[in-house]
């Protein structure tokens, strides 16, 4: 049961039981060894059964995989939480094996409805939409920011012309963006820890990228401040910038397989529904 549960305390308790079975002394492992399938995580307290925000207008939710907790691979999530804490936000983590499971999704939906965070940072991969075409994160009326925990090491990421590998681009950028999430950057790479000579083993863990984490937290902070202008009835000025190719006027806003002009018109039309002062919106 302990090995099935996962988590550092359960692993320590399992090793203690093995030691006792071998006739060796092992100190008791204090604390709850069970790791729920879905729940809350706090930077200082770890997994908690209940959570209520003390400052709901400054709460940020970070959604991530339960497997990060089970394998004690939380350094990137901890550092991301610390970056938002430094900026004055309260942070709560919500973990689950997947966002697509209806049971877990229902729990997450209710949690987000209750907490009403000012932003959600998603650290899971791929699309989070289930068979009904919806994601449990959609219940939030706030932006959902996607971050990437790269499966490559830092050297490969730095040397690659596109940064993230094709697999990481699909997992962390393309499919989440199709869901409507805002890609905000990479926060970690996969690195080997120091080799244990006794176990003859090196763990590969998500290793935080300090400067990139600061960029992500700063970007989200600016989005939240921009939202506050709407609440204060001070409408910000928004521009849509489209790319082009020099000397090829027929390729204005060119995108492979996408109609960027139609997308821009649709975005402008949506903005007009939110009382934004827009005129002469093109029909295409």
Language-model region placement:
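An N-terminal assembly and electron-transfer interface module characteristic of large anaerobic redox
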Residues: 1-284
